[in-house]
Amino acid sequence: GTEANEVAMLMARVSTGGRGIICTDAGYHGNSTEVSKLSRPPQDINAEIRAIPYPQRYRPLQDGVSESELTELYLDEVRTAIDAFQASGIPLAGMLVCPILANEGLPDIPDSFMARASEIIHDAGGLFIADEVQAGFCRTGEWWGYEVNDFVPDIVTMGKPMGNGLPLAGVIARKELVDNFRQHRRYFNTFASSPLQAAVGMAVLDVIETENLRQNASHVGDYLRSELTKLQDRCEPLAEIRGQGLFIGLEWVSDRHLKTPDRDGAVVYVNRLKDKGFLIGNAGALGNVLKIRPPLVFTREHA
């Protein structure tokens, strides 16, 4: 995934002639020198990276506004980042985000934000990159996370889920972008076109199709969220249940009214479940979101 995002950033920069990349302030896209710049606190990000507040409904930029007004507030953050690049003499290359904001805690994204942000990026001469390393391959009940938010990116990156854990990654883009990239930049990878990785990747696609795992993720995910919702009345710290398919985020708080994040409490439950043989994690900018991501073969009986 790291290398896929690095190639995608390079492709966007070569294709547009720009350098500036917009990301969110709580994402994670890899650990190489260049890609890790997208995952640092805003004050540590260099001049060619601008981080915006990630769009969400639970802790919005401003309380008491309508859905459309909230969307506009977050879109203004995109516009402000573009203006800041222009003021610094840095042309825009694009915006890179996970389309379901997985590491941000799977927040409920204000309506039409992704589609309209993509339009703003295009109008400014940039490209929209969807990091599908976590969201892709039917995890959400759709093949791709960007389908959940009803938009089409210019570049899509993929990682180890496409090989079911075997090291495998990929970058997909429109033909003209790929042709332009190959014409202006020499890219070589010793491990490209590996027969073993290719065979595993094809096997993963076959299993997803023949075992109807996309539909399974959608149906079982709906059931699991409905069962978790029944627990809310008995579980005060469980403030909100979010996500799509078999990718679920639970907002864990110490006070529902004040929405006080409880990272320590979330970590306690992560470890308790680990002791019982269930592996989940904590995510989000505040570290208080329980991230539940079972295998695509997870059934109602398991749930």
Each language-model region and where it sits:
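Conserved N-terminal phosphate-binding loop of PLP-dependent enzymes in the Aspartate aminotransferase
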Residues: 1-303
